């Protein structure tokens, strides 16, 4: 899966899109395989449940903000 697709899916998760009804269900499940989870709290925070997921989530968030600037 490309970084571009991962970042798009991450952005959609950040804005609360329902992952169960998403057209890229397989890709989102792939992200979940890395341990990505969404925490439903006021801060819209993310967590990763595996070591690889933590590293990948950190990398994607950094990459996402680089593209914003």
Where are these regions (language model features)?
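Short amphipathic alpha-helical interface segments
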Residues: 1-22, 62-64, 68
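Generic leucine side-chain signal with a strong bias for well-ordered alpha-helical environments
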Residues: 9-13, 31, 57
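Short, hydrophobic-biased segments on the C-terminal half of alpha helices
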Residues: 25-29
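A short, conserved structural fragment
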Residues: 33-42
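Minor-groove-contacting beta-hairpin "wing" of winged helix-turn-helix DNA-binding domains
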Residues: 44-49
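Short, amphipathic alpha-helical interaction segments positioned at domain boundaries
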Residues: 51-69
């Amino acid at each position: 899966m490309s970084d571009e697709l991962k970042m798009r899916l991450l952005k959609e998760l950040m804005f609360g899109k329902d992952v169960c009804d998403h057209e890229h269900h397989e890709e989102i499940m792939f992200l979940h395989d890395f341990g990505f989870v969404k925490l439903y709290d006021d801060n819209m925070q993310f967590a990763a449940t595996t070591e690889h997921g933590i590293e990948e989530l950190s990398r994607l968030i950094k990459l996402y903000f680089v593209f914003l600037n």
